[in-house]
């Protein structure tokens, strides 16, 4: 593993830019034959899907927003009142009165099992893929090489143009690029969750360190923390006759307490189960107490399962130390035990989108608009109440309002904010720059690390740096070395080379993959997925 000392190891953006420019002048080699075959395949698939739309959905032109909206609104109208209306919830904006068929909305519907949405995603992807593959063919020279121009953004991230390689879906690009020399093999070394990892480590958000290292994955783990199974206890101070927990029947007879205080609540998310049975409702607790008296709360609460079965589950209550001495009524959160929780693809994707938006300064209202499936307000509160992230956002906001226009990365590289439309946009940019800029710094260090490593380990004649994209490096390994070295050993070498730890940060995770260099085409319907990066 590459140990990086942020006070000693200094990024070299100039060297990174020169190195990548040299790689692009040499060129990225395209398998032209496969590229053309794939282009023709996707053009044919696009036409097949277009015919399907007419047959299955009565939509003669899937490029027509009006026809798509008419179909969706018709389907939404068929949903009975009182039944959850996914299409209306996801695709219709109450504030503007407008419908959307954008990628994000279609992915959410697809994740919930709507075949129309997946077919539309496939059609659009097939169209985009065919156009992209045609572009690669047009930009390639007589040797099948493309030579993109490179520029650096304000964060020092590398951008490619003519062709715009960053806009090409990764799985598609990796399917058609091939080694510079025949017989060699390309390996991808991908740094996983780099941007959220930088934010968590940079701010010192120790509550999220576990999520970075969890085998369940960063976003699944954070989701489970955010939406962990809970109930609530409402403590009514100097209101009820006795200092104890009251049953629902007693509260109903009293008639002085709102039913909202003692009515059972829904679980925080859809997929909470006990012994494989879904939880439909969770009992809440209502207790009377005097000011300055600690309430005595039960060790278990009842939950109602999908088949109306009722069972008791253990509950651990949060401390009342900061609340019980006050005059006002208060609530305590109880964390349930013995509950299994599964995160669906739709929930994970929406949580990830909301988390990344929050990282770059989105408001609570903005997060609530993003979240159509999960509780956006809960996500906002969960993230912004993490003390380290809360301090970071506050510090950046203050720094921006003081008139500063430059901000540093974790390595001290200074970045210029540039022009902003307003103060809020400037704050969002300042929240983003240290994260993206640190990512660029890391890439520059890894490029130097690669060159040093292959020299020190006698691998200079065995492998070379072929291409970089986002937080990923593509390594070309010589045919002769591949013949005598097992694939898992090559993967271990590349992991040791690229995996890194900055100071006392949680070590970065990398994923090593051997890229497909053959001419086979094996594509299934439902292939269109969210951006892989």
Residue ranges and their predicted role:
Residues 147-254, 346:
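Function-dense linear segments that define catalytic or interfacial modules
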Residues 25, 146, 229-275, 344-468, ...:
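Conserved catalytic core of nucleic-acid polymerases
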Residues 22-44, 273, 366, 371, ...:
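Catalytic palm subdomain of template-directed nucleic-acid polymerases
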Residues 299, 303, 326-343:
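Append "Rare intracellular matches occur via the same short Y/T/C beta-strand/loop motifs
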Residues 2-4, 26, 39-66, 384-397, ...:
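Polymerase palm active-site segment centered on the conserved acidic dipeptide of motif C
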Residues 108, 133-139, 171, 188, ...:
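Short, contiguous acidic/charged loop-to-helix segments that flank catalytic cores in large enzymes
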Residues 267, 271-309:
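Solvent-exposed, low-complexity, repeat-rich "mucin-like" stalks and linkers
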Residues 1-174, 183-185, 192-195, 205, ...:
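Conserved "right-hand" nucleotidyltransferase catalytic core of DNA-directed polymerases
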